[in-house]
Swiss-Prot record:
Its EC number is 2.7.2.3. It comes from the Bacteria. ATP binds at residues 212, 331, 361-364. Monomer. This is Phosphoglycerate kinase. Pathway: Carbohydrate degradation; glycolysis; pyruvate from D-glyceraldehyde 3-phosphate: step 2/5. It is found in: Cytoplasm. InterPro entries: Phosphoglycerate_kinase, Phosphoglycerate_kinase_CS, Phosphoglycerate_kinase_N, Phosphoglycerate_kinase_sf. The keyword Nucleotide-binding applies. Belongs to the phosphoglycerate kinase family. HAMAP family: Phosphoglyc_kinase. Substrate binds at residues 24-26, 40, 63-66, 122, 162.
Length: 405
């Protein structure tokens, strides 16, 4: 896709220019509002550093959570401003609003190399409005912060599948460029979508089958094997006639799973054993069981060791691997071994078989960090779960398509 990039903007010169950057800082916070995974913040740094060092007056936009169009302190970007200041080694100011008086005063007062973070763009209901006129009005107010000779850099890959004001509409009003992160993400996904080296193995987990139907349909023609674990595997197992007891089940998707197994049964690889739990609790009683031996009233929260071994054998010969979604409830240590085992098998294939491996953002990327695995063991860890899935499904990403215009 022919889009102008950050390099093009830097070549044109940014010294003294206001540059508005859309980043993805939708990071997890604990009850004390401390960031528990800085992955997305770390990924944003190269673009912000390059602009700051080039002398730009940088204004950063981002959202956090779903504040539903109103100011809610719980979703303030204050922890992000603090983390950015620490990681960049320079003070990043946080505006008290998005396009209000404080944002304008601070934007006007920026000097070369300064970085200003606007408050959560979703505090303004127009950010996610379905009304184009409302979004356009908000985009005009955002663009006004850049004064004359401004520019827009799209660097939040985790949001490019959303046609929202700070991602899409603002790009119509300012010269626009793909940031380094978005450029890298698209080139990686293009490689997987257009010319994956065989054998190509896709690993899908996560809770809902309904979220992954499109990607299974799209990738079944290209992938050699599709490994299915996580919460979504229980609907497949139920479709095969297994009693999954209280495990996560999308009853309304059983027929769809039956159809997928009928069409792609030679490619879909399912677990052969499970880790059952007496309840959904980190301290629950647990036991390793075969597919029809989950005790009555219990639920499965992870794939079992034989499944890890089987999946590992499939992955060991792969030359291209795309992984999206954990194999179990990795947040509970007792039910994290399936995810750890699959991640390690992917790392081993990357090193030992020279496979090109992509972790498709979201919970899979979080699990790599939570479990303390070597992030450098994968070829690429994406920052966008939903965006990467939609791209591989063949859907247009509005926030990328607009950059080509």
């Amino acid at each position: 896709m022919a889009v102008k990039t950050l390099k093009d903007l830097l070549d044109e010169g940014v010294d003294g220019r206001h540059v508005i950057v859309r980043s993805d800082f939708n990071v997890p916070l604990n009850d004390d509002r401390e960031i528990t995974d800085k992955g997305r913040i770390i990924a944003s740094l190269p673009t912000l550093k390059a602009l700051s060092e080039g002398g730009a007056k940088v204004i950063v936009m981002a959202h956090l959570g779903r504040p539903k169009g109103e100011v809610n302190e719980k979703y303030s970007l204050a922890p992000v401003a603090e983390a950015l200041s620490d990681e960049l080694g320079q003070y990043v100011a946080l505006a008290a609003d998005v396009v209000g008086e404080d944002a304008h005063e601070r934007a006007n007062g920026l000097t070369e190399g300064d970085i200003l973070l606007l408050e959560n763009v979703r505090f303004d209901p127009r950010e996610t409005s379905k009304d184009e006129a409302e979004r356009t009005a908000f985009a005009q107010e955002l663009a006004a912060l850049a004064a004359d000779n401004g520019a827009f850099v799209s660097d939040g890959f985790g949001v490019v599948h959303r046609a929202q004001t700070s991602v899409y509409d603002i790009a119509k009003l300012l010269p626009h460029y793909a940031g380094g992160l978005v450029e890298t993400e698209i080139s990686v996904l293009e490689k997987i979508a257009e010319s994956p080296e065989a054998p190509y193995v896709v690993v899908l987990g996560g809770s809902k089958v309904s979220d992954k139907i499109g990607v299974i349909e799209a990738l079944a023609a290209k992938a050699d094997k599709i490994i299915v674990g996580g919460g979504m595997c229980y609907t497949f197992l139920a479709a095969q006639g297994h009693n999954v007891q209280q495990s996560l089940l999308q009853e309304e998707m059983k027929e769809t799973c039956t159809d997928l197994l009928a069409r792609f049964g030679d490619k879909i690889v399912l677990p052969v054993d499970l880790v059952a739990a007496s309840e959904f609790n980190k301290d629950a009683e647990k036991q390793i069981v075969d597919l029809d031996s989950i005790p009555e009233g219990w639920m499965s929260l992870d794939i079992g060791p034989e499944s890890v071994k089987n999946f590992g054998e499939v992955l060991s010969t792969a030359k291209t691997i795309f992984w999206n979604g954990p194999m179990g409830v990795f947040e509970f240590a007792a039910f994290s071994e399936g995810t750890r085992g699959i991640a390690q098998a992917i790392i081993d294939a990357t090193a030992g078989n020279d496979a090109f491996s992509v972790v498709g953002g979201g919970d899979s990327a979080a699990s790599v960090r939570v479990l303390g695995l070597n992030e450098d063991g994968f070829s690429h860890i994406s920052t966008g779960g939903g965006a990467s899935l939609e791209y591989l499904e063949g859907k247009e990403l509005p926030g990328v398509a607009i950059l080509a215009q």
